[in-house]
Each structure stands twice: as C-alpha cells, then as structure tokens.
Amino acid sequence: MRKTINILFFVVSFLLLNSCSKDEKELLAVESNRIDNLHAPQTSDYSTNPPSVSGDFVKFNFSSGGITTDSSDWDIAFRGTTIAVNGGSETGTNGEPARNGNAAAYIIEDVFGNVNSVTESAFVQDGSSGFAIPTGSGNGWYNYDFRTNQVSPITGKVLVFRTADGFYAKVEILSYYKDLDPSNLENARYYTFNYVYQPNEGETSFE
C-alpha cells in the first residue's frame, strides 16, 4: 500500500512540475550587436540665417537590427548629429518623421557594460520643447570641436531607449565617421555604435 502511495505521489508531483514548466515563458537571450557605418546624411543651406538643414531621417529598428524605410515600424532615426525617437510629437524640425509609436529615451553617464537596467521615470519623448536626446555640442551624446570641425562621442554617455512597441535597448556611440576615421571630414555622418536589445516583453534588465 505504501509503495502504491509513493508511486502516486511521484506521478502527481511530476505532472504538477511539468504543468508549471509549460506555463513558464522561456525568455529569449538579450541581444548584443554592433552597427558599422550607418549613414545619416543631411543637406545644409548656409545662405539663410540661421542655416537651414534638410534631408530624410534614416530610421532604425532594434528588433530587426537594421535600417527600415517603414513609416511606422521604427524606433530611432538619425540625420546628421540629431537622433529622433518614434514617440511623443513633432519638434518642428524640417523633414522629421511622424511619430506613431511610444518610444522614449534618456542619457545616463556610466560605463556601457554597467548599465544593466532601465529607469522608467527617466524616459523623455520628443516634443515641442525638443528632442529626447538633446541636440548641440555638449548637450547630448557628442562634443563639437570648432577648431577641427570634428564631432566626438562623449565618453561615458549611454543612450537608453524604450522602443516604439515598448521594449528596451541601450546604445553606445563609438564614432561619427566612416570606418572610425575622423581625419577626412568627407567621412562624417557615418555612425558606428554598440547596442544591447532586450527582446522580452516587460523585461527591463540588460543582463
């Protein structure tokens, strides 16, 4: 009798454990990637005061890990040194894309590898007051040297994003020049950056 009870207990325990394991959602691995030479051209007209800038923003999707031409399926977009997010509203910038997602961003000063989680309260969206990633030398992700006309990413500036569909990513911009070569100004407006993308809904950790 005791043997029968033990067998029944084992069977019931196995079924319960198996049922629980099926209910638990298996998490996807956090994705770490590097993008090289993403071209973000712009046209500047210096005949006006102040000079005007035009050109399409180059849209990027973290889920696919690449450039997209889709007007709605994008997370961030680049033009020159400006980075837009697909969330909030228009800033009034010429040629900016329409926002139709819930993307947002903030900048944190830290070592890229040490930024392991998201601070929800820090997120900002684009709007009439400006871009979530501030523009201008020293305000956001870069410094501009007026003597050399070079743009340099600020060491320790990590860009944290909420994507258009509510997932999370962090970005470390390595260079603004093609093949990481700032010696020729013709190489400007080519982004190279590391990013980590959290592909699991509701997960805010980058580990």
What residue ranges belong to the model's regions?
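C-terminal motif of bacterial Sec signal peptides marking the signal peptidase cleavage site
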Residues: 16-19
